[in-house]
Amino acid sequence: MTVPDLWQQQAVGALREGKDVVVHAPTGAGKTLVFELWANLGKPRGKAVYTVPTRALANDKLAEWRARGWPVGISTGDISENLDAPILVATLETQKSRLIHGDGPDLLIVDEYQLIGDRDRGLNYELALALAPSKTQLLLLSGSVANPDHVVKWLRRLGRDAVSVKHTVRPVPLEETFPDNLSYKLPREIRGYWPKFVAKALADDLGPILIFAPRRANTEKLARQIAQQLPNPDPLKLSAAQKNLVGGHLAKMLETRVAYHHSGLSFAARA
């Protein structure tokens, strides 16, 4: 059983008082637990719609909560299943029309709400939040919004009873460095910025390494470049079942201890 921290208890308490809650906490601190506590371990007191930015995240949440035996549905544009479940995982765009027309849930959770400032998707987020029915409580979650208090003030100007809950302690300390600070001298055969950077970081014992790419194609291309360039003295051995699960292309790359991850992969491959 997870014992919630004080800030998580404060957020849940505010929700139970009927307030909108804007949570600002670092990645991994436990923002999702606020909703899970409100949901009473899968037995929520009303209808909840938990929105996430991508279909991949929606599928992950669906699988996670269903594995606990929770009654969960999903709506992501390409998939609509069990829409009347007490908990619905969705992309926000699939819910926008319902919210604007006053058909909102008891609680709308917007995970990674910093997308309100996104050039392409921000308008949908802003409209959904601004026009959500007053009977729908809002729970906004993020760790990368510079001015969460401004968001609270904006919600209050809309006539909503909103509060901010902040937690600044990172579960894992964050350290920053620059490629020039890495001391490892590269073999001449390693070419390209990212293969060189990864080789240096691994030599300085900074692995595992996670690199974010802007598009699916970039993700696979970058992974191939790194896999081809890095020395591989200890190939990863995969079973026949594992190779069949992820497919030949990704399996071959995994043997070099390099992989890619995006929404185009099956849930089993991503897991």
Residue map of PLM features:
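Conserved interdomain linker/interface between the two RecA-like ATPase lobes of SF2 helicase motors
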Residues: 113, 127-131, 136-139, 144-225, ...
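Inter-Walker segment of RecA-like/P-loop motor cores
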Residues: 59, 64-104, 166-171, 176-179
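Conserved pre-motif I regulatory segment
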Residues: 1-24
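Motif I (Walker A/P-loop) of helicase-class P-loop NTPases
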Residues: 30-40, 121-126
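Conserved SF1/SF2 helicase motif Ia
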Residues: 24-26, 34-60, 133-135
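SF2 helicase catalytic motif II
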Residues: 92-95, 99-139
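Conserved C-terminal RecA-like helicase domain
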Residues: 49-52, 56-62, 66-74, 212-271
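Short hydrophobic/aromatic beta-strand immediately N-terminal to the Walker A/P-loop
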Residues: 21-24, 49, 139, 210-212
